[in-house]
């Protein structure tokens, strides 16, 4: 633990904690200051001026990052309208129909996304208390309840990911890997920020985006200059 703290302290050297950096520079610094031995994530945290007790100020959806985020998303497809072979052909990791739902609780640590259609949702409702807190409950807002299951699988395997505000109005997301080209991570970040700006609720007053920070899986957080509020 002491060794990690020492590495983290060293990683902060050369970074002005009071300064906000241009987005490209912040990403580059986060890549350079990562202290993991593996190819860690580059993450973005966006603080928004939202009152999340109001439903209209709770943001949730999904986005296809231009360059993906480097994560292998494990997809479970629940459908009786397509075959296992069709699902596998577009990259699904697991597949089943109504009788497969009983297996889900045993494999929560093996799946990242469940994609299904509206017909299956009543059967999944009984697992709401299990799937909801883990962010696994399919939802049409994020494209995981759809009539075109095969297309949705392709999109999520290519890098479509969910975004949502937490209780405090923050959005946290992985936007790439340390090994990515900096420009590609910047492109991902700009795509997300553009989407967030487009989703600004009409009832929000004052500065909408209050803070942006970039950080590696392990390493310092770096403030970003906020533009176009």
Swiss-Prot record:
Top-level taxon in the UniProt lineage: Bacteria
SUPFAM superfamilies referenced in this protein's UniProt entry, alphabetically: Ribosomal protein L1 (SSF56808)
InterPro entries in the cross-refs: Ribosom_uL1_bac-type, Ribosomal_uL1, Ribosomal_uL1-like, Ribosomal_uL1/biogenesis, Ribosomal_uL1_3-a/b-sand, Ribosomal_uL1_CS
Keywords linked to the UniProt accession: Repressor, Ribonucleoprotein, Ribosomal protein, RNA-binding, rRNA-binding, Translation regulation, tRNA-binding
Ranges in coiled-coil conformation: none
SUBUNIT field: Part of the 50S ribosomal subunit.
Protein known as: Large ribosomal subunit protein uL1
Organism annotation: Ureaplasma urealyticum serovar 10 (strain ATCC 33699 / Western)
Encoding gene (name): rplA
């Amino acid at each position: 633990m002491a060794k990690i703290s020492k590495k983290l302290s060293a990683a902060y050297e050369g970074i002005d904690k009071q300064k906000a950096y241009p987005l490209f520079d912040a990403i580059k610094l986060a890549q350079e200051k990562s202290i993991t031995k593996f190819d860690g994530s580059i993450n973005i945290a966006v603080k928004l001026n939202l009152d999340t007790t109001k439903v209209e100020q709770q943001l949730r959806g999904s986005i296809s990052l231009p360059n993906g985020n480097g994560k292998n998303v494990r997809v479970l497809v629940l459908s009786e309208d397509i075959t296992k072979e069709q699902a596998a052909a577009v990259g699904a990791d697991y597949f089943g129909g109504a009788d497969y739902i009983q297996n889900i609780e045993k494999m929560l640590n093996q799946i990242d996304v469940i994609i299904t259609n509206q017909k299956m949702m009543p059967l999944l409702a009984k697992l709401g208390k299990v799937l909801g807190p883990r962010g696994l409950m399919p939802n049409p807002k994020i494209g995981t309840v759809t009539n075109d299951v095969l297309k949705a699988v392709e999109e999520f395997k290519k890098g479509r990911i969910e975004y949502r505000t937490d209780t405090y109005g923050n959005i946290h997301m992985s936007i790439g890997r340390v090994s990515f080209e900096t420009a590609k991570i910047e492109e991902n970040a700009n795509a997300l920020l553009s989407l967030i700006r487009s989703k600004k609720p009409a009832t929000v007053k004052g500065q909408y985006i209050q803070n942006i920070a970039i950080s590696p899986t392990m390493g310092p957080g770096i403030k970003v200059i906020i533009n176009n509020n």
